[in-house]
Design a protein with these regions (language model features):
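Alpha-helical tetratricopeptide repeat
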Residues: 1-199
């Protein structure tokens, strides 16, 4: 039953139906394409896009994650995941997906292909996070952020505590720490959570 040629035919048929606005029809075509070639991540990201149009966001997220499982280097899967999470108003998680997309894109063969689109997504996520927080006090932001176990863990990490203390007296020090990928990911998480203010 596996047949990459048939899979591509169905995927193209799905794309045509999608452009015509027949999203349920495109979901069926993409589903057939996935059955014919489950190792091609494009079927999943295409179907995720159609599900998003149908407001079936949990299904769309599942497909975006499945595309990432099939091919962890497929940048468009992370872009799709970011868009789905944004639609779900999960702005912090959407921001993380966009950051992962950016990292994978810049490491990809042939150089970065999607940086403009990804930069747009990063800005969109940050603006949404700022808007969400604009009517919160610092205490409320901290309280909300600390409900995320990952944020709480970072805040209790002695290395991060000393970096944050250092950054209060010398903000430029953060830039140096950003060169370390492990620390950078933690700093980005705190920025996204609103604990580190960038404006």
């Amino acid at each position: 039953y596996i047949d990459p040629v048939k899979a591509e035919e169905e995927r193209n048929r799905g794309n045509t139906l999608y452009k015509e606005g027949d999203f349920p029809g495109s979901v069926q075509a993409y589903t057939e394409s996935i059955k014919r070639n489950p190792s091609d991540p494009r079927g999943y990201t295409n179907r995720a896009s159609a599900y998003t149009k149908l407001a079936a966001l949990p299904e769309a997220l599942k497909d975006a994650n499945e595309a990432i499982n099939v091919d962890p280097k497929f940048v468009k899967a992370y872009i799709r995941k970011c868009n789905v999470l944004f639609s779900m108003k999960e702005f912090t998680k959407a921001l993380e997906a966009a950051q992962t997309a950016s990292d994978i894109d810049s490491e990809s063969e042939g150089g970065a292909q999607h940086q403009r689109e990804i930069q747009g997504l990063l800005n969109k996520c940050m603006n949404a996070l700022y808007a969400q927080r604009s009517d919160e006090t610092d205490e409320q932001t901290l309280e909300r952020a600390m409900r995320d176990p990952e944020v709480a863990g970072i805040m209790q990490d002695p290395v991060m505590q000393s970096i944050l203390q250092q950054a209060q007296s010398n903000p430029a020090a953060l830039q140096d720490h950003m060169k370390n990928p492990g620390i950078r990911a933690k700093i980005q998480k705190l920025v996204a959570a609103g604990i580190i203010r960038t404006r």
